[in-house]
Each structure stands twice: as structure tokens, then as C-alpha cells.
Amino acid sequence: MAGHSKWANIQHRKGKQDKLRSKMFSKLAKEITVAAKMGDPDPDKNPRLRLAVKAAKAVSMPKDVIERAIKKSQGGDAEDYSEIRYEGYGPNGIAIIVETMTDNVNRTASNVRSYFTKFGGNLGTTGSVSFMFDRVGEITYKPAAGDADTVMMAAIEAGADDVESDEDGHWIYCGDTSLNEVSEALEKVLGESEEAKLVWKPQNRTNVDLETAQKLMKLIDALEEDDDVQTVTANFDIPEDVAARLDA
């Protein structure tokens, strides 16, 4: 399987997540509300809600905002959201998966299509690119959790399938249906993880040049800034020297 994306680390260091923090809060709150509405409002009894709350805490979402999102799910006025996945190709044939949560499917489909068209890509049909990705659980630990061997042994014992470690941390991968089980087993050995979530993991990544990277970032930024879009995943990586020139 393809290694953890260096681009994701570079993106994080450049502060892109801070720029999108307010958007991120609203997207996470929506996921919490939907998860609580679909299951039990108690995170201990609702695996999806537990993961959503964990993701919110990972970006320091205030406790009262989390509780308000859960409470909203129990009200009669809670919106009905549809979860729709869009797939397509960005510049240079880079495969992109866009996960959305929307109360207006027509609006979202039109917006997503327009972003792909505007920034040199084209929207495909469901299944047109997802075969190039694996749906897996991803559990993230900071470097302080231990050295690579320690984390690898803990992951194997917990039932994980793969581990990737570098100076930025550890990424542990498992089957999509065993994420909660593996995450809980790891917590007993390594402590609480930084993040645990379901992801689309590219089977291979393509390194891109500066021009392609610039086009891709414009497309991904447009998608991520849309209130209906929850996640954007693509099978490319930006080498560090290209990333440095992106911000120059």
C-alpha cells in the first residue's frame, strides 16, 4: 500500500488546517449530529459518534459545542442529511474522492461538478476512481507514543494490518469494520490516539510537479471550502522541494 502522504504533513505544517478551523468545526458538528441521530446519543454506545467526538477533540473543539451538536440530534428540527460520495479526476489524471453530507443533493452535485470543471478536472460516476483506494481505518499517534518497533508490536497485537512511522508520528491501518476494536486495544497499550477515523487510502501515489500541484490545491481548496463537503482524498503527493516552492 502507498505510504502516508508527506503532502498531508506539509499541508499541516503550513497552517492550512488553522485557516479552515471554523469550517472544520461546522463540518465536525454536522457529523456529530448525524451520528447521534442515527444511533445512540451516548458516544460509549455509538461507535460512529465516538469517532466523531474524538475527531472534534483532536482539533480542540470546545466541549459545549460538541454537546450542543449531540443535543441538536434529539430535537425534532434536526435536518435530514444525505451522505453522497463523488468521484472524479483532477489535473494530470489525479484520482479524487469527495465525501459530502447535504440537505440539498442537487445543490451539492452542481457545486462539486463546477469545481472539477473550473480547475481542470472532470467529475466521474460512483466507482470510477474508488477502485484505486482501500477503505480502511487509520489511527494516528504522535512520535512520543514510542519508537517504530514498539508501535508496530502493539499494532500487530491489536489486530492492525499495517503501520507507517516517520519523524512526524505513527499511522496504524486496519480493516474498516475493526477500527473501534483495534483503536480500543491500542489505547490500553499506547494511550489515547491523536485521531481514529475511516479513510480512503490510495493504493499508489503520484508525485506531482509545481504546475500540477498548484492546480490541484486550487481544486481541493474550493472543495474543502464548500459547507457540504466533509472530506477530500486524492492519490498524489507533493515532494518537499515542490511544496516549498508552492508557498514561495
From Swiss-Prot:
Primary location class: cytoplasm
Natural source organism: Cereibacter sphaeroides (strain ATCC 17025 / ATH 2.4.3) (Rhodobacter sphaeroides)
UniProt GO cellular component terms: cytosol
GO BP, sorted A to Z: regulation of DNA-templated transcription
Region feature Disordered, mapped onto this chain: 1-21
Molecular function via GO: DNA binding
Compartments, as annotated in UniProt: Cytoplasm
Family recorded in the similarity comment: Belongs to the TACO1 family.
Protein name: Probable transcriptional regulatory protein Rsph17025_0577
